[in-house]
Amino acid sequence: PCVIHTDDAHEYMVLVKRYNPNNTSDKETAFLVCNTKGEILLDYGKDTEKGELNMVYLMDKGANPSILCVYQKNGILTMHYTPLPLNKSALKGAGTAQDPYQLTCSNDFKLIDNNPSAYYEVANDIDFLSIPFEGPKRAFTGKLDGKGHTLSNLCLMGRGLLNEVKDSAKITNINIDKPILLLSEKHLEMAVGVLANSLQGGVDTAGVASYALLSNVHVANPVIKAAGYKEIIGTIVGYVALNTDVNTCSVTGADIVAPSAQVGGVIGKSQTYSQIHACLFTGNAEGRIVGGITSEVSGGEPVYDCRVDADLYSSNTIGGIVGHSGRSKIYNNIVYGTLNLSDTTKVGKVGGIIGHVDTDATGASTDILAENCLVALTSINVPEGKDVIAHRVIGFSSGDDYEYDWDNVDWSKPQSEWPRLYFAAEKNFKNNYVISDLAPVDATIQLTDTTTEGANIKAEDLSQTWLGEHGFLFGEEVTAPWVYGKSLTLWFEGELNTGVEDVVMPEGMKFDGTTIMAQGMLEVYNIQGILMARANGSINTVGWQSGIYIIKSATSTVKLLIP
């Protein structure tokens, strides 16, 4: 799409024989590109210096498409390349806040390189047709507003749609559906995400901070395959830092397989005064260090008001919300799903909220590290007979950390037998609870709200009043993002598939909240097209994950949101 020209007209390439209008006996071969508006965009015929047109190639498979025309004169071939698209600097708009550039098709994104500090809007839904795409290369410092439109079927290899995004850049209101991101050991980017590799604010020479923003960006059904890639992956952005705010973002239906990489369900890694809040991750993710929201926070980067409902897999470290925390504050989050540690060759670290919390060797810090978090996991699965530190709330923390008693080391013995001095148990956890159906992982730890195992609470006791008393704010905005219902959700979750909830069931089909009923044979598929159930007359949906399903009966097909 938009290879030849990035407007909304359809283009045609024509190879013709034509007469010279001034000499009807003089014929030439000509190559023309025209569009459905009756315009001739390109006209290559005989050239007085190069000779007759001999061959034409459309070279559209790489990152820099072009048209190659080959001329012949006196036995000498001359090649002429025309870069595509033909309107490399032509975007509607002026690039200002009042009149942003309009992005109308896939190749328009490449034109961002011409003015990366300008204002841009996505003018309509854009289908990238699963064709490998390489976006702009220069650092983007402008504003990009998706206006709620959807970019579908992105196919990215080795890097995100945008490369580096920095300074006071803002990216908002974009939906991305069914993107594919492929990575291998050959790819050298230190961090990669579907939308952007990195997003950073900054500080100018006078010490004035500039803030970057990522807000209301939603990625549905992403597939990320990264065999051999060992760096950082975040579904939306690989790495955020330096005064960056990430809020109201979601990743749903993810399928991420990156066994050697750090994997964050939403953001790969957060560093240097950034924050992530009011974000959602659902699906499954596999990596070396895995966090449902982010794989790592370096310290001073809060993660709060986030929800995860996922199956997470790792050979090293897993946290339902954060994989590895350098003592950042993680609060008012909830996690559903399962945590699964594979047959690790190192010390495995697993926590329902945080997999690993760095030790404060001084013991002087009083900063709260995990507060008002809820663990509603179905299971925490770790291999038997392996060196694993796992707890329902926090995996590894200071109570599991040690230094060697160097004064009493017997140097003739192996290191595994050297005496150890363990640090005191971490004191900076409070008000963390676990739905009591999940058994304690470590029976030696007290089940209180200040320990790594957390306190038990029954699901029926999670009233809106109790949650409000523990910092969960209810409303329909980023500062009060929670909705109380069958499960605790974020306010925007019901809007991710706008209109689906309002589908009117056709006559003869009913859904009472748990059972789908219709005359004759029924089939139900999930949003990925996988058959979930087939039955005559009725299908019970109790125990199904919340989400969008496709229902087929003998007379109709409809979409249904199962809460």
Predicted features by range, described:
Residues 1-4, 50-60:
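Repeated scaffold domains used in trafficking and secretory/extracellular systems
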Residues 37-38, 529:
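Short coil turn/linker residues within repeat-based beta-strand modules
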Residues 22-32, 75-83:
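Structural motif
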Residues 11-18, 65-71:
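Short beta-strand elements that form the blades of beta-propeller/WD-repeat-like
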Residues 3, 8-12, 67, 505-512:
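Eukaryotic scaffold repeat domains enriched in small/polar residues
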Residues 42-46, 533:
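Aromatic (tryptophan-biased) beta-strands that constitute blades/sheets of beta-rich domains
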Residues 45-47, 80-497:
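Surface-exposed repetitive/solenoidal architectures
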Residues 501-563:
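C-terminal outer-membrane/trafficking sorting elements
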